[in-house]
């Protein structure tokens, strides 16, 4: 079983990686976009980490929904709605659970990807 604490660690490590690599992400975005991806993602995940004390107290579904809403409100461009949708849909698929099986996590990720497809009309 995957504990909620493991999912919190996953988001924390992801936020650290975004922060560490924000310049590289921005440089990559400059080649095809408006050179703001790293900055926007760092801003969003910095806010997620600031909200982590209250997020960590919630069940897994509410935790993922909180991450998603934060990203929707703080990350600009196309990334905010895409990442926000991923986490919102994962939260909706999670219900009020405190731990997940690998199969349940896979189903949540699939629900998140389906949400991105719907948002992007892919």
Locations of regions flagged by a protein language model:
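N-terminal loops that bind phosphate or other acidic moieties
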Residues: 1-122
